[in-house]
Amino acid sequence: MNKFLYITDQDEYSDHSFIGPLFQKYLTKHFDINTTFFSKEKSEIEIKEDGRIIIPEKSKSHILQELEKNNINLNEYQFVVVRNNTDLLKEVLKQKTKYNFKVGFRLSFPKRIAKLETDLANNKKSILDIISNKIQTYSEVNLINECDIFLPTSFQMKNDYFKDVKVRTFVIPSAIDPDILHDNIQHEGKEKRFFYAGTLDKLREFETVLEAFSTIDNDKYKLMISTKDPEYLDDMLSLYPNLRTNIEICDAKNREDLLKLIALCDVGLSILPDIALFNSSTPIKVLDYYSSAVPCIMSKNENNTS
């Protein structure tokens, strides 16, 4: 069986629910797979029985060298795929000929572009940022073109941000593992419960959603919000005092807590501005809603209707 190394950009304790099922369950029928994660706490590599390899954060810049030091034979891998991080991709490509493996690049979400768009929304984007973005994009395209395959979340993501990539492209959208679906729990209240999970900032324009709810002239609904941006949420809610009694702020500590809250709701919310960043991939919150059998109101765009 061919060996496959998947180098992620994620911490060992972050949510891997959309990496794990594909690379640690379904593809293991066809490949012997190792998946790497990083740790800020650990000082030495840990190799788990399930194929995970935990690498100290300090070794990030020389990951292949660190793997070899720990008796992991890189010559045994036929395929190496890097997730999101082009610095890691650059190191892997330098060793491609030496170890004779094929290289892929997985783009789950364009994080650098997201930061640029957020800076634009906050009036922090300068001409230097625009020039730097063009240079970085050119460099990234060249790196991806050295790969054997490009694995974006959607063709729209490729066309919007990496249209000059010429290598073979195979789309891998985020998905739900059918083995870990959650039951939808009917709540006892008569009100309709709406749920929003995720980031709140100026770029996402959540005040548009609040504005819509503020026009409802009855109290037969509840808007539940779980976010890691509570201060930003408080600032927004201060502009809509008539919503206070209809809003419940939730503090989900982890994904399991979040899914339990979602399962008690009637409708999920994922209404986002009509910009390329949000139109090119399905937000994780949508998959969280669907995995608990909760329907979702989302933006109308080509990606969401496909």
Q: Where are the regions a protein language model picked out?
A:
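Conserved donor-binding/catalytic core segment of Leloir-type glycosyltransferases
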Residues: 5, 151, 186-204, 209-214, ...
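Nucleotide-activated donor-binding/catalytic signature segment of Leloir-type glycosyltransferases, i.e.
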Residues: 234-267
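Glycosyltransferase donor-sugar binding loop
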Residues: 40-42, 197, 222-236, 251
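Membrane-proximal helix-turn-helix segments that form the acceptor-binding/catalytic region
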Residues: 90, 105-115, 126-150
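Carbohydrate-associated surface elements
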Residues: 156, 175
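Nucleotide-sugar-dependent
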Residues: 12-14, 201-204, 256-261, 268-290, ...
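Active-site proximal beta-strand in glycosyltransferases
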Residues: 79, 96-121
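N-terminal subdomain of nucleotide-sugar transferases
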Residues: 1-44, 75, 211-217, 301
